[in-house]
């Protein structure tokens, strides 16, 4: 797998929540769902190349999957990784700008 293909597989989706929106407004931090095996360097490179912004820092957390029941059977949702990407001063990335129009 080439490096370009790997960068495309690192970022899965932006994570939109109330906390993520507040972080974006206050501290210029964007939250992404990322591949479970991705590291901070890969995440920073992927964001910088795909969105053409300068990344200041990356923090990651593995979110544990919830246990769910369906009748008498129990199952478990998959674990997933969340990355908080802080952009450099003056950089901006807005996912919901076009949705308001």
UniProtKB/Swiss-Prot annotation:
GO terms for biological process: translation. One of its GO terms (cellular component) is ribonucleoprotein complex. InterPro entries: Nucleotide-bd_a/b_plait_sf, Ribosomal_uL23-like, Ribosomal_uL23/eL15/eS24_sf, Ribosomal_uL23_CS. The keyword Hydrolase does not apply. The keyword Transport does not apply. Belongs to the universal ribosomal protein uL23 family. This is Large ribosomal subunit protein uL23. The lineage of its organism: Bacteria, Pseudomonadati, Pseudomonadota, Gammaproteobacteria, Pasteurellales.
């Amino acid at each position: 797998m080439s490096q370009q293909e790997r960068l495309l597989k690192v970022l899965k989706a932006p994570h939109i929540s109330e906390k993520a929106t507040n972080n974006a407004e206050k501290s210029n931090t964007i939250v992404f769902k990322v591949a479970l095996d991705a590291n901070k360097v890969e995440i920073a490179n992927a964001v910088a190349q795909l969105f053409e912004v300068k990344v200041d820092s990356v923090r990651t957390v593995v979110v544990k999957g919830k246990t769910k029941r369906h009748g008498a059977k129990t199952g478990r949702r998959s674990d997933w990784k969340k990355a908080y990407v802080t952009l450099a001063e003056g950089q901006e990335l807005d996912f919901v700008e076009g949705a308001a129009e």
